[in-house]
Amino acid sequence: VREMMIPLDDYPWVRIDDTLKYAVRVIEEAQLQVGRRASLPRVLLVFDHADDLVGIVRRRDIMRGLEPNFLVSQPLDERVKFFDVGVDPHLSELSANWDFQKVVKGLRDQSSRPVADVIRPIHTSLGPEDQIMKAVYEMVSLNESLIPVVEEDRVVGVLRSVDVFHELA
């Protein structure tokens, strides 16, 4: 695992009380250099103020957290209808159900929410000396795409499924 992990210093992270807006900026600006390949992260690590890893946040968690309140309170099939707008080749009007300004305001309001509202817990970790097949088993059995690497009770890096897959290929 040590040979394939991304060192903690090279991986993007946020604090638990950072805003979703800040998390969007961090994940958008981050680029990882993995061997000779450039790669974009799909997950941010989340730390508390004692520098303990408390969870992760994926891009889709951030997007879910940005959904305006007036949509969240509706059943999923009603939310989908809200965005079921036919394409107007002249773009002169949008559907009566579509209130773009309301959506934009809702997104802006939600962007000030803390990352803590959408955090995902850590389900497992690996040691730097663990074999790659243990990582494969953990990723597959727990449906995880990123696992922290811990040495002496301290996070030293992360292992991503994309890097494991690349190595196996």
What does each model-found stretch correspond to?
Residues 1-10, 59-123, 136, 140, ...:
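Tandem CBS (Bateman) regulatory domains
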Residues 11-13, 123-125, 155:
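Conserved beta-strand scaffold positions in the cores of enzyme catalytic domains, especially
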Residues 14-41, 63-69, 125-143, 150, ...:
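The conserved cystathionine-beta-synthase
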Residues 30-32, 48, 101-104, 109, ...:
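Residue-level detector of functional hotspots within protein domains
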